[in-house]
Structures are given as C-alpha cells and as structure tokens.
Amino acid sequence: MDALIEEVDGISNRTEFNGKKLLDGTETDGFTFQIGANAGQQLTVNIDSMSSTALGVNALNVTDFANTPFDTQLESIDTAINNVSNQRAKLGAVQNRLEHTINNLGASSENLTAAESRIRDVDMAKEMSEFTKNNIPSQASQAMLAQANQQPQNVLQLLR
C-alpha cells in the first residue's frame, strides 16, 4: 500500500505542463486561458491537489485494522476515488468547452480569411475587360497621331 501511496504522490508531483505543476495544488489561482479575441474572454481552470494527503489516503495501513477499522479505510479510498472522479468530470467539461471554442475560433478565422480574400483579390476577368476597354481608345489615339505626323512627310515627298 505504501508503494501505491508513493506513486499517487509521485504522479501529483511530476505532472506538469510548460513548467507548471498541475496536480500538486500549488497553482491556487488556477490556469487562465485566453479563449477569444477580446480581453474579457478568458477561461480559468482550477485543478485541486491530487496528492495522497489531499485525497486522504496518506495514512492508510491495510495491515493494521486495530487502530483504523477496515470500513473506515475503505471509506477513505472511496472518498479519494470520488474526488478524483469529480476532478476528472470538471476537467472533461472544461475540455469540451475548449474544443467548442476551438471550433468557433476556427470558423471565425476561416470567415475572416475569406473576407480578406474578397477585399484583396482581384476579379481577373473583370479587370482584363476594363483594361481592354480603356486600352482601345489609347491605341486609337496613338494611331491617329502617327498618321497625322505622317501627312506632312508625305506632302514633303510630293514636293521633291
């Protein structure tokens, strides 16, 4: 039983993410996540201590029922299991909320990208049509100017 209690404490002390211990109860303010674009859109997750002391199983002794009756020790184990189950249920609810938030943010990101694309991207067919429409008068003007410049040359050649 001592080995199991040590393992519970070991898991409680070793479980960490990003340098922060998750299950030892030291993060009393919880873990805060930014889940939206605005400043107030945050989610705080509190994780209770899962150490053997916090769970109430650190003093179990399954070989000595004289000082602590078997029923009392069994109740301690049941209470610890219930505490762990309750914490897992809370974390599962938070996980569902985060997954929902991830899906919403993904849809928002896709919509924002599509809107930006509509603003930035050019309708090539329309723009080529506009270019051609504007280019025809310009080319016609250049051709007329070239012909007008040619006429004095033709007159000079006739006079020679």
UniProtKB/Swiss-Prot annotation:
Gene Ontology molecular function, alphabetical: structural molecule activity
InterPro entries assigned to the protein according to its UniProt record, in alphabetical order: Flagellin (IPR001492), Flagellin_C (IPR046358), Flagellin_C_sub2 (IPR042187)
Localization terms from the record: Bacterial flagellum
Entry keyword Membrane: no
Pfam family, any one: Flagellin_C
Assigned keywords, A-Z: Bacterial flagellum
Remarks, miscellaneous: An N-terminally truncated form of flagellin of unknown function.
The name this protein goes by in its record: Putative flagellin YvzB
